[in-house]
Curated annotation (Swiss-Prot):
It comes from Renibacterium salmoninarum (strain ATCC 33209 / DSM 20767 / JCM 11484 / NBRC 15589 / NCIMB 2235). InterPro entries: NA-bd_OB-fold, Rib_uL2_dom2, Ribosomal_uL2, Ribosomal_uL2_bac/org-type, Ribosomal_uL2_C, Ribosomal_uL2_CS, Ribosomal_uL2_dom3, Ribosomal_uL2_RNA-bd_dom. NCBIfam families: rplB_bact. This is Large ribosomal subunit protein uL2. It holds the Pfam family Ribosomal_L2. Gene3D superfamilies: 2.30.30.30, Nucleic acid-binding proteins (2.40.50.140), Ribosomal protein L2, domain 3 (4.10.950.10). Belongs to the universal ribosomal protein uL2 family.
């Protein structure tokens, strides 16, 4: 993937860039692998906003991605197309299996139209092949990693993401995640070889607010710039700091929301570096 930069012909074009989509081989999705995707506008079933800054955007269809691949062990598949998916940053690959089945997978880097991929313990170590961690050599770069055997890929699925298999000991494999965290994962869990493609995605400059609106992202307005009727931080004479611990528009305290005693925390060997410890 490359990035095409625009000339500053208008204020919105100044500094903006777009993917060149050179790797895309098909513009319409496989009809049997898409489902309707109605928009919620960030509202729940009673109409209350539960997620702010969502609404509008272009219509989309959801592409059904195969995050498991267990049922196709030993069945060869040809990469028929590399496609754009509006629901994720990564590209997706359409596989035609020799038994006639069609499936979508996350497209890894260097996977091309016409390549063959396979799943199963005896598959070769090459991009796009899916194997249990116990059958992958230490040091291999992988993506689309399961957290529980048979649970489907959960980690390293976005553009440019990858995980490194750093060790295997007993029934656990140690993985270095993109955040720097090292975590134990059951060796029966499966992963796909290679890193996710479209790594240049993070370098795209959207250029103007309108392009974000096309994606369904609405403006983020600070609470301190609102009126008291709109937000607990609103109001005051002149500029204020809000005068209290940060809260959401409903008055609920904001900040760290991750459970500190999550069950899977016991599998973390080394925590990710945060704040001043990032260096």
């Amino acid at each position: 993937m490359g990035i095409r930069k625009y000339k500053p012909t208008t204020p919105g074009r100044r500094g903006s860039s777009v993917a060149d989509f050179a790797e895309i081989t098909r513009s319409t999705p496989e009809k049997s692998l898409v489902r309707p995707l109605p928009k919620s506008g960030g509202r729940n079933n009673s109409g209350k906003i539960t997620t702010r800054h969502k609404g509008g955007g272009h219509k989309r269809q959801y592409r059904l991605i195969d995050f498991r691949r267990h049922d196709k062990d030993g069945v060869n598949a040809k990469v028929a197309e590399i496609e754009y998916d509006p629901n994720r940053t990564a590209r997706i690959a359409l596989l035609h299996y020799v038994d006639g089945t069609k499936r979508y997978i996350i497209a890894p880097n260097k996977l091309k139209q016409g390549d063959f991929v396979e799943a199963g313990p005896s598959a070769d170590i090459k991009p796009g092949n899916n194997l249990p961690l116990r059958n992958i050599p230490v040091g291999t770069t992988i993506h689309a990693v399961e957290l529980r055997p048979g649970g489907g890929a959960k980690m390293a699925r976005s553009a440019g993401a990858s995980v490194q298999l750093v060790a295997k000991e007993g029934r656990f494999a140690q993985l270095r995640l993109p955040s720097g965290e090292i975590r134990n994962v059951d060796v029966r869990c499966r992963a796909t070889v290679g890193e996710v493609g479209n790594a240049e995605q993070s370098n795209i400059n959207w250029g103007k607010a309108g392009r974000m609106r096309w994606k369904g992202v609405r403006p983020t307005v600070r609470g301190v710039s609102m009126n008291p009727v709109d937000h607990p931080h609103g109001g005051g004479e002149g500029k204020t700091s809000g005068g209290r611990h940060p809260v959401n528009p409903n008055g609920k305290r904001e900040g760290r929301t991750r459970r500190p005693n999550k069950e899977s925390d016991k599998l973390i060997v080394r925590r990710r570096r945060t704040g001043k410890n990032k260096r």
